[in-house]
From Swiss-Prot:
Signal peptide (residue range): none
Gene: MAPK6
EC category name: transferase
Ranges of compositional bias, category Polar residues: 701-715
Primary location group: cytoplasm
Residues at which ATP binds: 26-34, 49
Protein name listed in UniProt: Mitogen-activated protein kinase 6
Activity control note: Activated by phosphorylation at Ser-189.
Catalysis: reaction(s): L-seryl-[protein] + ATP = O-phospho-L-seryl-[protein] + ADP + H(+); L-threonyl-[protein] + ATP = O-phospho-L-threonyl-[protein] + ADP + H(+)
Residue positions of motif FRIEDE motif: 332-337
Source organism per UniProt: Pongo abelii
Stored Pfam families: Pkinase
Subcellular location, record wording: Cytoplasm; Nucleus
């Protein structure tokens, strides 16, 4: 166990000393690897997130996350226990000490699962979805009151304990502080929210957004809980916007004009009536739930409900209790930002670039949309910053095929292919988003030196080239079809390469062969070969010893039936099979049986009626064979056990001439004269002729089997012996 633990620690570089044991990987967070481990001090399982500090940018993100999660304390937020350095060392409160470390460990609360795993099993009941949505809004109300944006809300970052149905928000690796008194335009990172949960404003202005982006993501998550599938699952940002416009109405004219300047091919004169409203995307939900969702998924962030307003909606009235929905008592402000601390130089801080509003009462919705460029110059870069890395999901930017990289983007050394990216953060005119693009280029499946989405695009002739030009639309359509064909071909090749179909067929054949061998092993008697052998033997001369054995066997059977304490030598199943074959034997000689009665009091019945039971089943299963002779014939027992009482002999004498009667136990005692069915009288060893065959039958469900000619009885005995 110790060797396995040390190996796992060495592979993933976990260095926490001997305090934490039983490491198990959980996944990757926004900026680190997450493991679960058992804390030996308290014997409790915790989640540990490792953040590698390789450059100033990673240090800044780590410090930002640590500052945020240390201050956030809420029932619906994953709790953080402590922050550790290498070898499990305790970190000081001096945030500048992070610059001297190569890694940091965040020990936090362990949760059973996440919402993404739950939704893989299918949609939730509306009541469960409403309960989880209430807890999500309750946590968002606290987070936003602390002037924090999560910026990466998705089902995988919402953790759940299934026992008490408690939901908690986690993974603040992409969260940041945003003081509403300051304009953060141009200083916000781009494309951080997972593509399927990005709001329309985030798609149009990726570096100018507000807390409303978290509310849009929450609405998409609520719809996903109700349907079990992603609400807007676009392959790239252009398709993502198209899917949104098909279901979300555009009410304000200024929003429609902005869209008209970006993607006019999708814009109509009247955008208030979408083609596929939410009622079609979410059939079966209640009217209150639909109204609640429509007020969250609005195109304009100014019309969107805040977390506090959503909690006051009538749909949440059964859970909402404002006195139990706390807000942060110590919110973050502009001085809590970390850029100046990390860069260790006041000249490198971006605080001096921020503009202080004269009226600090402005809300987040009152920020100007555009500041440095006209609205007509807005371009939409159809990049898909997907979390997956498969070749099928890689999105191609049509502009990459144009000549001259430097003609497409700003003349800035940060985007020069020959320019080293490492020292770029030292320049005073460096923008943090450019370095972020360079750093995460390998994860977003795109060119490593793409510029900002909208405001940093400069085209060759300094003219606005909208995304509705024919060549670009055709390129995007062709790419989509080709990627679909490639996906189909690749899926087939993988299936053939992995041998899934062949393996499945081989497994089925092996199962069938094993079942066949098992049947051959368990079957007690092959009736086909037996019949063939008996027919061949029937033509041979009957030896004397066989006749003697038949007489002895007949006598033994008649005496065994009179001994009530002797257990039956065959199972109930063989008795049923014997009854069926006897019924067929009687049917063969129907003429001699038609007038025979069974004397059994009130329970008597015609024996020909008894033999016709399940006759229809004989037609359906005429090829079914059973070994019924085990019932009619058994070996002779020890003479000491065959003694009978005189009373029973008397009864037997009284009924000796009867062909059949019912005893008290419901069994049918059969006594058939051999001469009536054409079997010759054999002589017993004592010289007395054998004139009858006796057997015991139990009325029950019978199965049919082929008839055997009476001439083969002696050969059958030979086979049994």
């Amino acid at each position: 166990m110790a060797e396995k633990f040390e190996s796992l620690m060495n592979i993933h570089g976990f260095d926490l000393g001997s305090r934490y044991m039983d490491l198990k990987p959980l996944g990757c967070g926004g900026n680190g690897l997450v493991f679960s481990a058992v804390d030996n001090d308290c014997d409790k399982r915790v989640a540990i997130k490792k953040i590698v500090l390789t450059d100033p940018q990673s240090v800044k993100h780590a410090l930002r996350e640590i500052k945020i999660i240390r201050r956030l304390d809420h029932d619906n937020i994953v709790k953080v226990f402590e922050i550790l350095g290498p070898s499990g060392s305790q970190l000081t409160d001096d945030v500048g000490s992070l610059t001297e470390l190569n890694s940091v460990y965040i020990v936090q609360e362990y949760m059973e699962t996440d919402l993404a795993n739950v939704l893989e099993q299918g949609p939730l009941l509306e009541e469960h979805a409403r309960l989880f949505m209430y807890q999500l809004l309750r946590g968002l109300k606290y987070i936003h009151s602390a002037n924090v944006l999560h910026r990466d809300l998705k089902p995988a970052n919402l953790f759940i304990n299934t026992e008490d149905l408690v939901l908690k928000i986690g993974d603040f690796g992409l969260a940041r502080i945003m003081d509403p008194h300051y304009s953060h335009k141009g200083h916000l990172s781009e494309g951080l929210v997972t593509k399927w949960y990005r709001s329309p404003r985030l798609l149009l202005s990726p570096n100018n957004y507000t807390k409303a982006i978290d509310m849009w993501a929450a609405g998409c998550i609520f719809a996903e809980m109700l349907t079990g599938k992603t609400l807007f699952a676009g392959a790239h940002e252009l398709e993502q916007m198209q899917l949104i416009l098909e279901s979300i109405p555009v009410v304000h004219e200024e929003d429609r004009q902005e869209l008209l300047s970006v993607i006019p091919v999708y814009i109509r004169n009247d955008m208030t009536e979408p083609h596929k409203p939410l009622t079609q995307l979410l059939p079966g939900i209640s009217r209150e739930a639909l109204d609640f969702l429509e007020q969250i998924l609005t195109f304009s962030p100014m019309d969107r409900l805040t977390a506090e307003e959503a909690l006051s909606h009538p749909y949440m009235s059964i859970y909402s209790f404002p006195m139990d929905e706390p807000i942060s008592s110590h919110p973050f402000h502009i001085e809590d930002e970390v850029d100046d601390i990390l860069l260790m130089d006041e000249t490198h801080s971006h605080i001096y670039n921020w503009e202080r509003y004269h009226d600090c009462q402005f809300s987040e919705h009152d920020w100007p949309v555009h500041n440095n460029f006209d609205i007509d110059e807005v371009q939409l870069d159809p990049r898909a910053l997907s979390d997956v890395t498969d070749e099928e999901e890689v999105q191609v930017d049509p502009r990459k095929y144009l000549d001259g990289d430097r003609e497409k983007y700003l003349e800035d050394p940060a985007f020069d292919t020959n320019y080293s990216t490492e020292p770029c953060w030292q320049y005073s005119d460096h923008h943090e988003n450019k370095y972020c693009d360079l750093e995460c280029g390998h994860t977003c499946n795109y060119k490593t030196r793409s510029s900002s989405y909208l405001d940093n695009l400069v085209w060759r002739e300094s003219e606005v080239n909208h995304y509705y030009e024919p060549k670009l639309i055709i390129d995007l359509s062709n790419w989509k079809e080709q990627s679909k064909e490639k996906s189909d071909k690749k899926g087939k090749s993988k299936c053939e390469r992995n041998g899934l179909v062949k393996a499945q067929i081989a497994l089925e054949e092996a199962s069938q062969q094993l079942a066949g061998k098992e049947r051959e092993k368990n079957q007690g008697f092959d009736f086909d070969s037996f019949i063939a052998g008996t027919i061949q033997l029937s033509s041979q001369h009957e030896p004397t010893d066989v006749v003697d054995k038949l007489n002895d066997l007949n006598s033994s059977v008649s005496q065994l039936e009179l001994k009530s304490l002797i257990s039956k030598s065959v199972s109930q199943e063989k008795q049923e099979k014997g009854m069926a074959n006897l019924a067929q034997l009687e049917a063969l000689y129907q003429s001699s049986w038609d007038s025979q009665f069974v004397n059994g009091g009130e329970d008597c019945f015609f024996i020909n009626q008894f033999c016709e039971v399940r006759k229809d089943e004989q037609v359906e299963k005429e090829n079914t064979y059973t070994s019924y002779l085990d019932k009619f014939f058994s070996r002779k027992e020890d003479t000491e056990m065959l003694e009978t009482e005189p009373v029973e002999d008397g009864k037997l004498g009284e009924r000796g001439h009867e062909e059949g009667f019912l005893n008290n136990s419901g069994e049918f005692l059969f006594n058939k004269q051999l001469e009536s069915i054409g079997i010759p009288q054999f002589h017993s060893p004592v010289g007395s002729p054998l004139k009858s065959i006796q057997a015991t039958l139990t009325p029950s469900a019978m199965k049919s089997s082929p008839q055997i000619p009476h001439q083969t009885y002696s050969s059958i005995l030979k086979h049994l012996n």
